[in-house]
Each structure stands twice: as C-alpha cells, then as structure tokens.
Swiss-Prot record:
Gene: CNN3
Lineage start: Eukaryota, Metazoa, Chordata, Craniata, Vertebrata
Record's function text: Thin filament-associated protein that is implicated in the regulation and modulation of smooth muscle contraction. It is capable of binding to actin, calmodulin and tropomyosin. The interaction of calponin with actin inhibits the actomyosin Mg-ATPase activity.
Family (UniProt): Belongs to the calponin family.
Calponin-like repeats: 164-189, 204-229, 243-268
Name of the protein in its database record: Calponin-3
Keyword list, A-Z: Acetylation, Actin-binding, Calmodulin-binding, Methylation, Repeat
Length: 329
C-alpha cells in the first residue's frame, strides 16, 4: 500500500491548519457516525477520517439515498482506486442536489486536509435527504424550505395598491410639492386653498411659520447711536436721562469735556464753584490764578502791602571783596 508522506506545517500553513481544526465539531462527528452506520449498515471504526478515507462507505451511502448513483465501487487498497471512489461520490451527490459550495474536495478527506469541510458536506447531505423524505432515527441536518408559489389575478394586485398596512411604510403620500428653496420666503396661505390673506406682516398663524415679521429694517451699524423711540410709531420722545427698562441707550455717557491724553485736568468748574474768599498763598511772584489767568506783581502788592517794598533787598554790599584765603583753585 502506497502512502503519501507529508511533513509538518510551519508558519502561515500551520496557523491556517490550526484555525480550521479549531472549528471541528466532535458532537457532529458522533451524530454523523451514527447516521451513516444506520443508513449503510457498515461500521466506520474509531477513527472517523480513516474509516471514510477509502470511499467505500461513502459510495454505499449515496447508493442507499439514491439507488444506482455509483455503479462500480473499488475495494482495492491502493490510493488511486480510493481516490476514484471519493470522486464518484462527489459527482453523485452533485446529481442528488447538493450545492457546489457545500461539497468538499477529495484531498480534504484523503490527506486529512480539511475534515471540517467534510463534516459540513455530510451534514448538508443528511438535511437534503430529510427534505426528500428519507427519515431515520438520528435527527441530523436541517430540512430545506420548499418553494411555495402564490399567484394573484390583476384585480387583487390593483386592490392592494390602495391599502397601507400597519407594519408597512409608503412614500406615496409624502412629497416635496410646494416646498421652497432653502432661504426663500414662505407664504402664510396657499392661493389654491382659497383662504383669506393675512391682515398684515405681523399676523402669524399658530400652525404655520413665517420669516416676514423679522427683518433688518432700521438696524444700525455697530457703534452708532440707537433711538429710544420710533417716529413711525408716533411715540412720545423722552429726554436723554430717561432709560426704559426694556431698552438700552448710550446717550447718557459721552466724551464731552474730556481733555487730550496727558494734559492737565481742572480741579473745579467755574460754572458750579464760587470764587475763593480766603487769600491764596503763592510760592512765586507770578503764577496761575484760579481762573487760569496770570497774577502780576501789582496784584501781589495790593494783597500784601507790608511785605512788598517795590524791590528786593540785597543782603550783601556791592563793594564786598572776596578773598581766596590762600585756597588754590
């Protein structure tokens, strides 16, 4: 007997093999073992893969489900007759009605390459046999749903177009008819509905929306003065010191009388402060008065006659001789 020698897998091949092996269902293997032995009457053995490797039991299985599917079953111990049995089984289950994506390849079983796919194929075959009416005591596989065709006449089809189910939706009732472009004005009434026009621009319906009432008419540039009253509304004007509780104003505050930055500031205002009655002591013969005028010597002489002699007294005689007293400069 010839055997294929296959070394261990490494790297990505080993990773893929381990991932496929992790999906293998041992409970499904036991159910398949019982189902195949019940249908064929043949024992698989302890090793599921080695018991099906020669393809003899598989050919007997499809012949039980569909008699005459495999006409010749090879019982040789050589590899090529065994591969031929597996190939005949694959062709037979395709003719039986199996989907191509549910069928395994010959190497998946013969070389133990992907026993998970072999298991998937046999479970699908059991479900297809159940669908065709082949029942056993082993409940395995899922029965395929049968096609149930319904035909309706034209009258029923047209009648259903006007019925909206509670669990269905429709887009026939809703449309964008009459919708205006974004940003344009919306009318408060529809001329087609023959409703009365609104009285003025300030009338807004409770169930409608409008942008007619709001505008930028009368809006001022940033920083300009705002009026407290509107002449169009025939309201009584108020003075500059009156500020409404619901309005704002900037008329009270101003820069009137403000001097240039860095200049001197007046301590008092002549309009509100009286002239001083007490004598003012000056530190010079001339100075600045309270009203901003200069004080002359005659004014100072009139205020202080005892101290003023017409001229300044010289404490030192004019013929005084200075001596160096031997100091060398």
């Amino acid at each position: 007997m010839t055997h294929f020698n296959k070394g261990p897998s490494y790297g990505l091949s080993a990773e893929v093999k381990n991932k496929i092996a992790s999906k293998y269902d041992h409970q499904a293997e036991e159910d398949l073992r019982n189902w195949i032995e019940e249908v064929t009457g043949m024992s698989i053995g302890a090793n599921f893969q080695l018991g099906l490797k020669d393809g003899i039991i598989l050919c007997e299985l499809i012949n039980k489900l569909q008699p005459g599917s495999v006409k010749k079953v090879n019982e040789s111990s050589l590899n090529w007759p065994q591969l031929e049995n597996i190939g005949n089984f694959i062709k037979a289950i395709q003719a039986y009605g199996m989907k191509p994506h549910d069928i395994f390849e010959a190497n998946d079983l013969f070389e133990n390459g992907n026993m998970t796919q072999v298991q998937t194929t046999l479970v699908a075959l059991a479900g297809l046999a159940k669908t065709k009416g082949f029942h056993t005591t082993i409940d395995i596989g899922v029965k395929y749903a049968e096609k149930q065709t319904r035909r309706f006449d034209e009258g029923k089809l047209k009648a259903g177009q006007s019925v909206i189910g509670l669990q269905m939706g429709t887009n026939k009732c809703a449309s964008q008819a009459g919708m205006t472009a974004y940003g344009t004005r919306r009318h408060l009434y529809d001329p087609k509905m023959q409703t009365d026009k609104p009285f003025d621009q300030t009338t807004i319906s409770l169930q409608m929306g409008t942008n007619k009432g709001a505008s930028q008419a009368g809006m001022l540039a940033p920083g300009t003065r705002r009026d407290i009253y509107d002449q169009k509304l025939t309201l009584q004007p108020v003075d500059n010191s009156t500020i409404s509780l619901q309005m704002g104003t900037n008329k009270v505050a101003s820069q009137k009388g403000m001097s240039v930055y860095g200049l001197g500031r007046q301590v008092y205002d002549p309009k509100y402060c009286a002239a001083p009655t007490e004598p003012v002591i000056h530190n010079g013969s001339q100075g600045t008065g309270t009203n901003g005028s200069e004080i002359s010597d005659s004014d100072y002489q009139a205020e202080y006659p005892d101290e003023y002699h017409g001229e300044y007294q010289d404490d030192y005689p004019r013929d005084y001789q200075y001596g160096d007293q031997g100091i060398d400069y």
